Amino acid sequence: GLLAACSPGTTTASAQTPAPATAARHPVSGLEVIDLVVERGTQKLAFKVEVAASPEAQAKGLMFRTSLGDNEGMIFPSAVPEPRSFWMKNTVIPLDIIFVRADGTIESIADNTVPYSMTPVVSGEPVAAVLELRGGLAAQKAFRASTSCLRSCGRLSR
């Protein structure tokens, strides 16, 4: 698994176990949906995120989506930490693009990215995953680089 598990005692090996056939699927994308918690101090915020694990799913991302709920998002895991670059081509709504280190801490946040922009949004260092949320949500919830931590309650592998 790329990010730490939500439950104490969950091992990395169990985090890499294939998801059961009954895994929740998103009605629009068909992608697996997992629980993800962002911790900021003692505050824990729960999200249901789609896992864009395949190259095709990562290339499409949230293109053409017209809405994204406050507790919804999409995560783009990497097999190994690597520099990541995203753009907003064909993306209708503003997004917060959150770059996540292998230990689950936030490396950086690109707030309220501009819809349809072809300007690359890049990580400042190699990252293990990228989380996209509704634009403005990271600031509203006071997520901060290095002080906020993501925890996955599902399989996060590519």
Give short role names for the model-derived ranges.
Residues S7-R158:
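Compact, glycine-rich, soluble single-domain proteins
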